[in-house]
Amino acid sequence: GDDFLIEKVRNYYADKYSIPVVPIDRKDKDARAIIITSYLDLVAQIVERNWQEHIQRLVQDSEYRENFFQLLPDTAFWQREWQTHSASSSQMELTEWAKQQFQPGSIDVNIMTKLDKKNTSNGEELPVEYNDAHAILRGFALSKLNSSVVLSAGMNPLLFSYMQKFADFFPGNDGNFRKKIIVKVSDYRSALVQGKMLAKKGLWVSEFRIESGLNCGGHAFPTQGHLMGPILEEFKQKRT
């Protein structure tokens, strides 16, 4: 299955970056969730390593820095900013400034909520938390990521309820979320229904990601073939 592929990818990149990993027993009834968690943590580790190397090269390698600035939308602005800070800052201060300006992106995870097949072990059906989508959600929730889960392809009330079990989906003492919820929707009605369903469980939707029903299927409600313009207008008129 896809979890087997993910494990192969994890081993490939662990070997490429010389990162030791612990083999996962695929006979473990929770292997799917463990594989997801281990893979996501590895991705986070690699991103962190590459980001640190990127910052170091920005500070120390002028050719690398100039090539990077050329990739940014406002090249001249960043060239001026760099000249201003480099003229009055130590290398350590410049490194800290660069870290603040050039943060790595969020490692988000997409879950197709309806792909939630039941699983068995030794011929016996496992509890619902071992269903495919439930296991993926658990794998994400238990990872070290500070990012978002994107719920797509319709509603799964059981999965929504299961999200309540993980503290990272709720705000911490500082009011921030370690794990945010993004819901893909095709129209306002879908956003309203799913948003209310999650709100009743105490779960906050950080973003509704709108996709036209003309170029994607499998959403909670079939659309009438409306284009994106009228869909966005309805959100604009009815948002509170």
Please report, for each region that a protein language model flagged, where it lies by residue:
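Generic, low-specificity signal for short hydrophobic/alpha-helical stretches with a mild N-terminal bias
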Residues: V21, D25, N122, N173-N176, ...
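Residue-level signal for well-ordered alpha-helical segments
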Residues: D28, K117, L126-V128, P171, ...
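Glycine-rich phosphate/ribose-binding loops and adjacent secondary-structure elements
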Residues: K179-T240
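Gly-rich Lys/Arg/Thr-decorated short loops/hinges at beta-loop-alpha junctions or inter-strand turns
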Residues: T113-S121, S143-L145, G175-N176, G218-L232
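Acidic (Asp/Glu)-rich catalytic clusters
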Residues: G139-K144, M163-D174, L198-G202
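Long, compositionally biased, glycine/small-hydrophobic-enriched stretches that function as flexible linkers
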Residues: G1-L159
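Active-site-adjacent beta->alpha loops and helix N-cap segments on the catalytic face
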Residues: A133, N156-P171, D187-A191, P222-Q224
